[in-house]
Curated annotation (Swiss-Prot):
The gene is CGR1. GO terms for biological process: rRNA processing. Residues 113-125 have a biased composition (Basic residues). Involved in nucleolar integrity and required for processing of the pre-rRNA for the 60S ribosome subunit. Its main location: nucleus. InterPro entries: Cgr1-like. Pfam families: Cgr1. This is rRNA-processing protein CGR1. It is found in: Nucleus, Nucleolus.
Length: 132
C-alpha cells in the first residue's frame, strides 16, 4: 500500500506521476543513475512508519503499565502509613510529656520546689545517658 494509492489522480503529487517533473533540491540524483524513473513510495506498510504492536510488545507494554501502577499505589499506601505513624508517635509523645508534668506537679505538692527541680534535672541527665 503506497501513500498515494488512496488518493485521487488530481491529488497525487506530480513527482509520482510525471518523470519529467522538476525534482526537489534536497532530493539529489538517484544512485543508480536512472533519473528518468518515477519516484515511488515504499511497498510494505511497515516501512511507511505505521507500526502495529505485536502481541509480545503489547504484553510488555501492559506489564510495564501494570508495574508502574502497582509502584504508584504502593507509594501512596506507604505515604498514608507514614502519616498515620507520625500522628500516633506525636500523640504518644504529647501524652508522655503530659504524664511527666502531672507527676512533677504531684511531687511538688509533697516536696519543696527546689528539690523537685533537682530531681527533674537528674532524671533528664539519666535519660540522656541511657539514650546514648
Amino acid at each position: 500500500m503506497s501513500a498515494s494509492s488512496q488518493m485521487e489522480y488530481k491529488d497525487i503529487p506530480k513527482r509520482y506521476i510525471d518523470p519529467s517533473a522538476p525534482k526537489d533540491v534536497g532530493e539529489g540524483s538517484r544512485v543508480n543513475g536512472k533519473d528518468w524513473k518515477i519516484k515511488k513510495d515504499a511497498f510494505r506498510v511497515k516501512t511507511l512508519g505505521v507500526k502495529k504492536l505485536s502481541t509480545w510488545e503489547h504484553r510488555e507494554q501492559k506489564k510495564l503499565e501494570q508495574q508502574q501502577y502497582k509502584t504508584r499505589l504502593q507509594d501512596l499506601k506507604q505515604e498514608k502509613e507514614d502519616a498515620k505513624n507520625q500522628r500516633i508517635s506525636d500523640l504518644k509523645r504529647r501524652r508522655e510529656i503530659k504524664a511527666e508534668k502531672e507527676r512533677y506537679e504531684k511531687m511538688a505538692l509533697k516536696m519543696h520546689a527546689k528539690k523537685v527541680d533537682r530531681m527533674r534535672k537528674r532524671e533528664k541527665r539519666n535519660k540522656m545517658l541511657k539514650e546514648r
